């Protein structure tokens, strides 16, 4: 059995391959000691590590494992998943939305990091908690799905009420810019969280499209744990990507690209 571990800032992603079969699992980073204990029961020759805490894990193993740069591991794993899911792309941007967000260009032979932003899952959870008091990720994302952004976010259609706007009316003119126009209304937790997720999605997409244009590609693959149980984020990112003239790809098990890639490098 081969084991790939991507130890990130919030989650530890684990891929196990044996006899042509693959399993995926996650643990919280706070459970890292338990993961280390489990790894120490395995054959070190079969352990492959990547991510920000890979070096720390490696130091506590009984013997030396293989450690890879997380960007290279994610690129390799994504390449495998894209082909397995029938997407044969010559070049593409891949946007990895974890606690923060990292952007990369790949031409199928090599990857290079082309940008990064602090907007990501960490902002959804942190700002979401400050606004609502909800700390559980699933409860937070479940709640957000039913939110009404129109009373919080100012859209182009709100400005051009009686005339045709020069750009799509569905574009956001100002995130949270409609709040002071609706002080007579109650803002629910769902409304607040939907708007938080929307601003994260719009920033991620804007950055992705910008670097895609810089590298003459229209393909953008979105991966990362922040899309888990978060259809609203997926929809915002997909709609904005299409609106900007690019092709979005969501990859099943994309959050495990780093762990998978570490096995195959």
From Swiss-Prot:
Query: InterPro entries per the record?
Result: ATPase_NBD (IPR043129), Type_II_PanK (IPR004567), Type_II_PanK_bac (IPR011602)
Q: Please give the Gene Ontology molecular function terms for this protein.
A: ATP binding; pantothenate kinase activity
**Which cysteines in this chain are paired by disulphide bridges?**
none
Q: What is its main location?
A: cytoplasm
Q: Where is the active site?
A: 70 (proton acceptor)
Recorded superkingdom: Bacteria
Enzyme Commission number, as recorded: 2.7.1.33
Q: GO cellular-component terms in the record?
A: cytosol
SUPFAM superfamilies attached to this UniProt entry: Actin-like ATPase domain
Sorted keywords for this record are: ATP-binding, Coenzyme A biosynthesis, Cytoplasm, Kinase, Nucleotide-binding, Transferase
* Summary of subunit composition and partner proteins: Homodimer.
> What family is it from?
Belongs to the type II pantothenate kinase family.
**Name of the protein described by the UniProt record:** Type II pantothenate kinase
């Amino acid at each position: 059995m081969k084991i790939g571990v991507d130890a990130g800032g919030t989650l530890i992603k684990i891929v196990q391959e044996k006899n042509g079969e693959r399993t995926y699992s996650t643990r919280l980073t706070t459970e890292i000691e338990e993961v280390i204990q489990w790894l120490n029961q395995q054959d070190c020759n079969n352990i492959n590590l990547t991510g920000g805490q890979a070096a720390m894990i490696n130091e506590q193993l009984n013997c030396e494992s293989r450690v890879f740069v997380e960007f290279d591991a994610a690129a390799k794993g994504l390449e495998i998943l894209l082909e397995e899911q029938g997407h044969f792309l010559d070049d593409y941007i891949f946007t990895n939305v974890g606690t923060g967000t990292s952007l990369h260009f790949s031409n199928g032979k090599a990857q290079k990091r082309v940008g990064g932003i602090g907007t990501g899952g960490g902002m959804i959870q942190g700002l979401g908690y400050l606004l609502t008091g909800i700390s559980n990720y699933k409860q937070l994302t479940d709640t957000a799905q039913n939110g009404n952004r129109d009373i919080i976010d100012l859209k182009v259609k709100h400005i051009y009420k009686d005339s045709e706007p020069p750009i799509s009316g569905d574009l956001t003119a100002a995130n949270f810019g409609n709040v002071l126009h609706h002080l007579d209304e109650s803002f629910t937790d769902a409304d607040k969280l939907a708007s938080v997720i929307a601003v994260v999605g719009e920033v991620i997409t804007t950055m992705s499209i910008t670097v895609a244009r810089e590298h003459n590609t229209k393909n953008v693959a979105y991966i990362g744990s922040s899309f888990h149980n978060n259809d609203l984020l997926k929809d915002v990112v997909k709609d904005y990507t299409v609106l900007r003239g690019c092709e979005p790809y969501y990859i099943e098990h994309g959050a495990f690209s780093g762990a998978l890639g570490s096995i195959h490098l």
